[in-house]
Amino acid sequence: MKTNYIFVTGGVVSSLGKGIAAASLAAILEARGLNVTIMKLDPYINVDPGTMSPIQHGEVFVTEDGAETDLDLGHYERFIRTKMTRRNNFTTGRVYSEVLRKERRGDYLGATVQVIPHITNEIKDRIISGGEGHDVVLVEVGGTVGDIESLPFLEAIRQMAVEVGREHTLYLHLTLVPYLAAAGEVKTKPTQHSVKELLSIGIQPDILICRSDRVIPANERAKIALFCNVPEKAVISLKDVDSIYKIPGLLKSQGLDDYICKRFSLDCPEANLSEWEQVIYEEANPSGEVTIGMVGKYVELPDAYKSVIEALKHGGLKNRLTVNIKLLDSQDVETRGVELLKGLDAILVPGGFGGRGVEGKIMTARYARENNIPYLGICLGMQVALIEFSRHVAGLEKASSTEFEPDCRLPVVGLITEWRDEDGNLEVRSEESDLGGTMRVGGQPCHLTKDSLVRTLYGADTIVERHRHRYEVNNLLLKRIEDAGLRVAGRSVDNKLVEIIEIPDHPWFVACQFHPEFTSTPRDGHPLFTGFVKAAGKYQKGQLK
């Protein structure tokens, strides 16, 4: 079967939810037995989001193959079974970087390098290579139609229809249809102007998904169809819903998947959305609720922890519990004290970089340990738990990390090339090592310790989880910490690196170096988050032992 492409653009305003809409459509097509993937084209100049501020851009989603990508790829993986790779996300910066590299190498044989054809050809090549082997590829173009940054991408997808055939390309445009209370009606003019802008670039949309806070009346949909030159059945009303997992069913109920399959001449069975119906049922029928505190340093933008928040909700689904998440700034804990943590059923400390707010996280880990509150530490959340235990239980009062204190005498956490023992002797490791002084990123296998809590939770001896960090537990100081009662519950398969720690005499205290949130989905959940939320429910009822 030849690959079919659906190009998803947005108009009128930003943040309309193109990623959720594209992922929901992909979920329906996957439920019809099609092999589907999704790509995200980002118009910013950064080569990737890896060094961008989480407060500006939101979280960096890590793929199995180690790509640092846009958070929308997290939505994609939560909605479809296909795993994303580095081919599923690229930026203007990545494209220009590659074109300039080819120019320096002489690949263009002395030609004048221009946006058309060189930049647009590079974009098209990446779209085609990323879609190889799939029946349908959804391509989300970041930004809003009319933005100057998006023009090369829009020109490239316009050319795709010419090169792969109009019968294998489809343009889906997401717009806003606002409701004006003073007039008592929805207004279609912004959508008409957005489509006009798209037409000026040479793209006639085939489908319009119209976002609104209410169902768009049939007469208004007919008006949009007439003025935008789109069949009325291809004007889809997408009203606000209380759960994003209702969107696949909402789109299917309006025949969107049937329209697309007929457009591409695809003969496939009806979509079976029973899994999504089960998710919706679990979400709508909880048996109780818990409050989990998340103590981080980027809490002013919840999207900085998007996958963690979603994973906690998935854990709630699997336990039939509503999870209320209380976001707490670690600097506030540092300055105002652990009083802020009272009344919580569980505590999670997520990942982060740098020293700001770290002492507040260490105080949080201590509070959870001393008060027998369920604790889940992720990445930096594991490192602060280790530092706290080292200082207050193992007697290593000066324990710290070289990330926060480059000259600290007892670095229980450090770059592999910085490990020191108790006598201050530096153990020099090779700078050529894959881990020495570099970011450890992507899926890594981990062997779980026999009789550990995590081995029971996972039900497996070996797991693969995704990492994104530079600092590791210092093995040279580990024995003293283990002798004080800390358990290493998971190690890298070569037995060199600590991946998971537990406190056996605590009811539920687990911390991991990897990021389990990246592999949690609403249909399957994740063993750590499911177990964590279950522990929160038991703690609330006084049943956690």
Curated annotation (Swiss-Prot):
Which amino acid positions bind ATP, per UniProt?
A: 15-20, 72, 239-241
Its pathway?
Pyrimidine metabolism; CTP biosynthesis via de novo pathway; CTP from UDP: step 2/2
The record's section on InterPro entries has:
Class_I_gatase-like, CTP_synthase, CTP_synthase_N, GATASE, GATase1_CTP_Synthase, P-loop_NTPase
Q: How is its activity regulated?
A: Allosterically activated by GTP, when glutamine is the substrate; GTP has no effect on the reaction when ammonia is the substrate. The allosteric effector GTP functions by stabilizing the protein conformation that binds the tetrahedral intermediate(s) formed during glutamine hydrolysis. Inhibited by the product CTP, via allosteric rather than competitive inhibition.
UniProtKB keywords: ATP-binding, Glutamine amidotransferase, Ligase, Magnesium, Metal-binding, Nucleotide-binding, Pyrimidine biosynthesis
List ligand-binding residues for L-glutamine.
Answer: 352, 380-383, 403, 470
> Which reaction(s) are listed as its catalytic activity?
UTP + L-glutamine + ATP + H2O = CTP + L-glutamate + ADP + phosphate + 2 H(+); L-glutamine + H2O = L-glutamate + NH4(+); UTP + NH4(+) + ATP = CTP + ADP + phosphate + 2 H(+)
Q: Record's superkingdom? A: Bacteria
List all disulphide bridges recorded for this chain: none
E.C. code: 6.3.4.2
Task: Kindly indicate whether the keyword ATP-binding belongs to this entry.
Answer: yes
For the region Amidoligase domain, give the residue spans. Answer: 1-266
Q: What else is known?
A: CTPSs have evolved a hybrid strategy for distinguishing between UTP and CTP. The overlapping regions of the product feedback inhibitory and substrate sites recognize a common feature in both compounds, the triphosphate moiety. To differentiate isosteric substrate and product pyrimidine rings, an additional pocket far from the expected kinase/ligase catalytic site, specifically recognizes the cytosine and ribose portions of the product inhibitor.
Name the family: Belongs to the CTP synthase family.
**Subunit-level organization:** Homotetramer.
Q: What is this protein called?
A: CTP synthase
Q: Which organism is it from?
A: Photorhabdus laumondii subsp. laumondii (strain DSM 15139 / CIP 105565 / TT01) (Photorhabdus luminescens subsp. laumondii)
